[in-house]
């Protein structure tokens, strides 16, 4: 792949139904497709919202089918956040919509995910482990978040150190603003302010380049 185009969706939809969340996601997907993105990453629990007290029920595949169709139509891999029922517990999870798969893959959110350009699956990473289980071929680590200023500052410091220590680019999609991309040296490439937008990154022969694309 001569150039890899990625984007973080700074998505903060306040909807009461999964269908409305999906429709809102599709606006971001269409905008990312206009930018010729190969990968689009949404924040934590983007498909349901956080819920007032407990995590909401996980959406079923039929509710999410429009996103899988969009992944195939635009040839774009989509990672979105949703609740997941795992071993009798409801936890934060990720949904992977791949243009080369006929079904939706679901994973526990963990601390994030690493992936290889063009691959059909994610490797969920525990950044708190002594030696994170990063795929040695991975080019990018993604972090889906929905944090305010105090936790955001903690997150960006942690992710920048992670990028430098493990020599991997890091893309953070944060619902509340400040989404960012660091290169494999831990250097900040681009960081967003608040509001709904796409934060994009392109990996080519000259390294990473970044931009901010308004949603409207």
Where are these regions (language model features)?
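Extreme N-terminal starter segment of soluble prokaryotic enzymes
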Residues: 2-8
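Short polar catalytic/cofactor-binding loops
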Residues: 10-15
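Cys-nucleophile CN-hydrolase/nitrilase-fold catalytic domain and related Cys-dependent amidase chemistry
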Residues: 18, 22-100, 149-168
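Structural motif
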Residues: 38-39, 122, 139-140
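CN hydrolase (nitrilase-like) catalytic-core segments centered on the catalytic cysteine
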Residues: 62-79, 131-198
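Short beta-strand scaffold segments in enzyme catalytic cores
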Residues: 80-82, 93-96, 114-115, 178-182, ...
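Active-site catalytic loop in hydrolytic enzyme cores
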Residues: 85-137, 148-149, 154-157, 195, ...
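Binuclear metal-dependent phosphoesterase catalytic core
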Residues: 188-215
């Amino acid at each position: 792949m001569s150039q890899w185009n990625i984007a973080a969706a700074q998505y903060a939809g306040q909807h009461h139904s999964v269908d409305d969340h999906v429709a809102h996601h599709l606006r971001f997907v269409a905008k990312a497709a206009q930018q010729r993105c190969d990968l689009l990453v949404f924040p934590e629990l983007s498909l349901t919202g956080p819920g007032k007290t407990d995590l909401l029920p996980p959406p079923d595949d039929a509710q999410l089918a429009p996103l899988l169709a969009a992944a195939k139509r635009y040839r774009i891999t989509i990672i979105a956040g949703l609740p997941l029922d795992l071993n009798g517990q409801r936890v934060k999870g990720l949904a992977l919509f791949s243009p080369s798969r006929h079904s939706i893959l679901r994973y526990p959110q963990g601390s994030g995910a690493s992936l290889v350009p063009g691959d059909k699956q994610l490797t969920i990473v525990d950044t708190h482990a002594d030696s994170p289980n990063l795929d040695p071929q991975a080019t990018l680590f993604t972090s889906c978040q929905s944090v305010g200023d105090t936790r955001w500052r903690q997150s960006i410091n942690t992710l920048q150190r992670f990028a430098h220590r493990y020599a991997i680019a890091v893309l953070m999609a944060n619902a509340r603003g400040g989404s960012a991309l660091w290169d494999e040296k831990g250097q900040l490439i681009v960081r967003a302010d608040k509001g709904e937008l796409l934060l994009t990154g392109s990996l080519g022969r000259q390294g990473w380049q970044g931009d901010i694309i308004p949603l409207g």
